[in-house]
């Protein structure tokens, strides 16, 4: 996801065709590689669907209308309009829905729950996508060479481990190839589809939705269940929204309707035509659709496409983690910028290694793309359902759509998403438990961190010395003042920071200027420089400064303070000292959280990145003071 920020920076100057190609390379990798396994999974996934004329046309009709309804209608017409100052993605949407429901605390809490659970499922998706995509590409080798079955997993692992190992170096150089490679991929998909359709043109009858309805009538027992496989054609739909901030709605929409949708539909119908003519080809209709001479080049192109799709979700996980950190739901981590030109190209080591471990376990544990498909559907449909719920709140409470218009539409959207999710629920017991368990663990971690930070602030505030009383005491008994500016980071605006009290106790001095600095993260992605800071003078050389950042802004505190042009405040590097407080949490029987959650929070706090690195403070101008807090 963050791969594209370089394009966003030059968005105004980029030609439409260049931006469209770039969008294809980043946004559509996941959904673009779905033809590798979707139709095969429908008939080979243990659903009990016979490979008959009516079943093939019925399944194709379901795929066709799913792409039209979910992607072309829901995402393109509605979800992409729910941008948070141009940014998309479930964390940005959650911030928007939280703002929309600000007057309704219970509803706001529900929006946070849906947003966090959708985000947690996205992390599961970020593990499943690389595993299932690369495995499905490698499985083409079974058709090209005999006896390679047992080499598929090792080769997939080599590719995937290599992909994660290069993340710290960035992908800016090879990233310029993503667009052209994926455009080539979609052109090949379309060409293969046309080739297949020419063999059995009657497959085009599946455009008629009656074939989809007929499928449910013929297969009453498995009609809904089969949607659990059909939804694989929609994997990656969430990326359309998540990457909107990098390219904008129009390039993403144009790429979908001009290139991606036609190529996908042609390929699915081409595979269907192939299976109509020869039911045995259902074992791998994607690769068997290609002429024999084209098989190896197609495997190579498929591998490149799946690597690009994997890179997109890995970068997306990095970007979403940054948003979650700044919104206060994940502990601070070391964030490395991998490009001096593109601000959004970042690397987060902890996330990278966690994803790599998850991917390796998935590949070794499931061994094939078909086995992984069960896990895939649960993550995809869960995230889609959470997105629809959040968008519904935005439509009704922020956009103020008339209920008579909005409610019937939203019911239809939620009904379809609910059917897809319900179809995947039974898969939880057939391999789909992984994304649910991973999502549950991540949800617990995020909510524990958020609640723990709230409780920590409350405990620190208890018995805090009010600032007016402290300043009044200084007027009565002035301490020795030294030259320079002391900046104390604090979450409260009305109490004296512990670091300031400790400094007074041990050093018996105050600086000429004392700044109580609070950093506030807004529910919007960016805050303009003109609105970055607020300044209030308390007298006696004391000032309150509040810095405002968006959830994708880089919180560079020294750079932000340099914009504060007040003659009485001097933030020059050699005259400014930063005082930080480092809390150590001691779990106790006090009210707040369960003891195990307090212990978990204490562990996360101990291992979180401190303010020094996160706020880009100069190492040689920082004094850190520790304090113990019972929770």
UniProtKB/Swiss-Prot annotation:
Keywords: Cell inner membrane, Cell membrane, Ion transport, Membrane, Potassium, Potassium transport, Symport, Transmembrane, Transmembrane helix, Transport. It is a multi-pass membrane protein. GO terms for cellular component: plasma membrane. It catalyses: K(+)(in) + H(+)(in) = K(+)(out) + H(+)(out). Its main location: membrane. It comes from the Bacteria. The chain crosses the membrane at residues 17-37, 56-76, 109-129, 147-167, 174-194, 215-235, 256-276, 288-308, 346-366, 378-398, 403-423, 428-448. GO terms for molecular function: potassium ion transmembrane transporter activity; symporter activity. InterPro entries: K+_transporter, K_trans_C, K_trans_N, Kup. Coiled coil: none annotated. Transport of potassium into the cell. Likely operates as a K(+):H(+) symporter. PANTHER family: LOW AFFINITY POTASSIUM TRANSPORT SYSTEM PROTEIN KUP, OSMOTIC STRESS POTASSIUM TRANSPORTER. This is Probable potassium transport system protein Kup. It comes from Pseudomonas syringae pv. syringae (strain B728a).
